[in-house]
Amino acid sequence: KKRRKKMARLIFDYPFIGREYRLEKETTMIGRAPENDLSIPDYSMFRKMTLLEQRTYLSSLKNVSRIHARITVRGGQYFIEDIGTSGQGSNYGTFINEIRLEAKKPYPLSDNDHLRFGPIETVFMAE
């Protein structure tokens, strides 16, 4: 019987991003720029919203840096790091359980940690 590989993921609850993002890569770049592995918003979903709906979320979304954070996995342990577009940390911060992370320092993630990229919230599920 094949064992399913454990797969950490982020769970979102917004109309402009998929409900679940699987952390399949060793390094996942997160931010507002569409080139990121995980872009906030998911532009394919965002484009389908009405202009009024888009405008409703724009003020929150502009507080997510173009390159905001990075999640890496080493030896089965996941880490999150606040990067920022210039590499000096994001303007509106990355948070674990409401604690703001120091820029450019990897923090270990635990199952059910509540993460925030600026105002955008998600939950980290270890598997």
Kindly label every feature range from the protein language model.
Residues 2-12, 27-31, 73, 79-86, ...:
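C-terminal boundary/linker segments immediately following FHA domains
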Residues 69-71:
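Buried hydrophobic-core signal for structured, non-transmembrane domains
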Residues 1-62, 74, 123, 127:
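Intrinsically disordered, low-complexity acidic Ser/Thr-rich regulatory segments
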